[in-house]
Each structure stands twice: as structure tokens, then as C-alpha cells.
Curated annotation (Swiss-Prot):
Keywords: Cell membrane, Membrane, Transmembrane, Transmembrane helix. NCBIfam families: PRK13673.1-3. It is found in: Cell membrane. The chain crosses the membrane at residues 3-23, 33-53, 62-82, 104-124. Its main location: membrane. It is a multi-pass membrane protein. The keyword Cell membrane applies. This is UPF0344 protein OB1184. Belongs to the UPF0344 family.
Length: 124
């Protein structure tokens, strides 16, 4: 499940960048198609993340539970910011504050996911 979650995140970030570039170039129709595919990836990301969070709750108990829940909330925050940035770009609205939130959420997710929680790089 961990590999599926990381793969879906990687594909999600790639599709996010492609959609951003297309919106900036003014290719609205292809950008909307990529955006819809990205929304399907969001569903996969949320489902696999929920399963991983449930595994943490069941298997590791209280010492790690707080960090697992913060990572889950930061992951949801990151998905929400990706969606809001793309929607703002499509409508031509400023997205500076959303980019700041995206950066903070991304750092939280990477640090907690890869370096603090079990199943990350430090626990292999």
C-alpha cells in the first residue's frame, strides 16, 4: 500500500505541474482534461492515505498516532491546495497565499512521511 500511495503522489505532482503549465499557456481544454485526471488521482491518494493512516492507528498505537494524524491532515491540506491553485489559475485569480500554504503542507508531508513515521527512509 505504501508503494501505491507514493506512486499516486508522484503521478499527482507530475499531473499538477503539467496542468499548471497548460493553464499558464492558455490551453484551457487540455488543461481541464489533465485537471480531471488529477482529480481521479486525488481520490486514489486520499483512499491509500486513509488506509495507511488506519494501519498506523491499528499497528503502532499511541506514541506515533499524533504524528500520523498530523501527516494525514497535512496530506489533505496539500491536496486541497493543489486543487485551489489550479482552480485559481483557471479563473485568473492570484494564488500567492495558496502557494505558501502548498509549500508548508508539502514540507510537513515529506518530513513526516519519509523521515519521522515508520515505513519511511529511516525505518527501512
Amino acid at each position: 500500500m505504501t508503494h501505491m500511495h507514493i506512486t499516486s503522489w508522484a503521478l499527482g505532482l507530475i499531473l499538477f505541474i503539467i496542468a499548471l503549465v497548460m493553464y499558464k499557456k492558455g490551453n484551457q481544454k487540455p488543461a481541464k482534461i489533465i485537471h480531471m485526471i488529477l482529480r481521479l488521482m486525488f481520490i486514489l491518494i486520499i483512499i491509500t492515505g486513509g488506509i495507511l493512516t488506519w494501519d498506523y492507528i491499528q499497528g503502532y498505537g499511541m506514541p506515533i498516532l499524533g504524528e500520523a494524524l498530523v501527516k494525514a491532515l497535512a496530506g489533505l491540506w496539500l491536496v486541497a491546495m493543489m486543487e485551489m491553485i489550479l482552480t485559481g489559475k483557471a479563473k485568473g485569480k492570484p494564488t500567492t497565499a495558496k502557494w505558501v500554504q502548498f509549500s508548508i503542507a508539502l514540507v510537513l508531508v515529506i518530513v513526516l512521511g519519509f523521515f519521522r513515521l515508520p515505513m519511511g527512509f529511516l525505518f527501512i
